Swiss-Prot record:
NCBIfam families: ribB (TIGR00506). It comes from Shewanella sp. (strain MR-4). Binds 2 divalent metal cations per subunit. Magnesium or manganese. It holds the Pfam family DHBP_synthase. InterPro entries: DHBP_synth_RibB-like_a/b_dom, DHBP_synthase_RibB. The gene is ribB. It catalyses: D-ribulose 5-phosphate = (2S)-2-hydroxy-3-oxobutyl phosphate + formate + H(+). PANTHER family: 3,4-DIHYDROXY-2-BUTANONE 4-PHOSPHATE SYNTHASE (PTHR21327:SF38), GTP CYCLOHYDROLASE II-RELATED (PTHR21327). Gene3D superfamilies: DHBP synthase (3.90.870.10). This is 3,4-dihydroxy-2-butanone 4-phosphate synthase. D-ribulose 5-phosphate binds at R37, E38, D42, R150, R151, G152, H153, T154, E174. Belongs to the DHBP synthase family. Catalyzes the conversion of D-ribulose 5-phosphate to formate and 3,4-dihydroxy-2-butanone 4-phosphate. Mg(2+) 2 binds at E38, H153.
Length: 217
């Protein structure tokens, strides 16, 4: 990761803190993973404060595969099985079956319908019977231990929500360029500047979490 491009956003700790504050304010953040991994940037919002306008941005500016990151215990509570029995994807992305709210949606495709589905899934009293399967929202199961266990956007999203003091559920989608190619760090930084969103990396979250552990120790 070319850290020099990120220097205007401060140190790793400062970048994470800016991201946490944005999430607390109901705004989006951009998270880039390692160059030797997916080398992609995801636009991430807190699920609990997600708006229809933010969902529309995810659909319009990103890949369109809008995912709901959930901790393992929530996936189990909703009885969401893995999308496939044997996950052979390159990075082991833990998709579950896709979902739709049973109440309050039409076809499930619109921004408003997808927000309704997400709010139904993350409700404190949500039950498996509240969700239809399949649907147009794609849950991702985060590994316990977060980015210290797996350096993925799914784990980074849950870590950020927990560090921000929010409900551990976040919505993400990969940022794409207008021509449909994947946005890399320079394009992600430009996107962040255009939309006044902080940019940080998975490595930043690792550094931040390790610093917290060191302070506790």
């Amino acid at each position: 990761m070319n850290q020099s491009l990120l220097a205007p956003f401060g140190t790793a700790i400062e970048r994470v803190e800016a991201g946490l504050e944005a999430l607390r304010q109901g705004q989006g953040v951009l998270v880039v993973d390692d160059e030797d991994r997916e080398n992609e940037g995801d636009l991430i919002f807190a699920a609990e404060s997600l708006t229809n306008a933010q969902m529309a941005m995810l659909i319009r500016e990103c890949s369109g595969i809008v995912c709901l990151c959930l901790p393992d215990e929530k996936v189990k509570a909703l009885e969401l099985p893995p999308m496939v029995e044997n996950n052979s994807s390159q990075y082991g992305t833990a998709f579950t079956v896709s979902i739709e709210a049973k109440v309050g949606v039409t076809t499930g495709v619109s921004a408003a319908d997808r927000v309704t589905t997400i709010k139904a899934a993350i409700a404190d009293n949500a039950k498996p019977s509240d969700l239809a399967r399949p649907g147009h929202v794609y849950p991702l199961r985060a590994q316990p231990g977060g980015v210290l266990t797996r350096r993925g956007h799914t784990e980074g999203t849950i870590d950020l929500m927990q560090l921000a003091g929010l409900k551990p559920a976040g919505v993400l989608c990969e940022v794409t360029n207008p021509d449909g190619t994947m946005a890399r760090l320079p394009e992600i930084i430009a996107f962040g500047a255009a939309h006044n969103m902080p940019v940080l990396t998975i490595e930043d979250i690792v550094v931040y979490r390790k610093s917290l552990l060191a302070n506790v120790g």
